[in-house]
Amino acid sequence: MAVGFKVGYYWFQVGTSDFLHSFFSTICIRLEHGKWGRVYPKLMGELYQGCLKNQDLNEGLEELHKVRKELKNFSPSDVIWDAEDLSLTPPWGNNISSDITDLSNYFVTSDGRDLISVLSEAMNEAKEMQCDIEIDNL
């Protein structure tokens, strides 16, 4: 089942729920020292739980910008597939594109786009439309 970001009547495709969970798990373990939502409460708390309200989008975008900057400091091998079970690895292992140079560009959606860019675009669209952004299944 496909998961993505819903903004009003717009859909921003991500991929599988496991893949999106990996993105948030990587943030938790690598940038929040295993304390989910402690550093990035809007992204990790509110959005991950399903919805980031319109009034919190500016703060969410600031957090996302910091996440991208911080993830540049980690190699692709530092990816976390599941914060609850650190023994799990991505199904593709280390077989990744040479275009992926660090964790800031590791996460690519099922339609080939950079996940952080897609999320930023969705959040900006939500700001423009004055609505919330939700994680939803297609």
Residue ranges and their predicted role:
Residues M1-E121, E125-L138:
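Acidic (Asp/Glu-rich) sequence patches and key acidic residues
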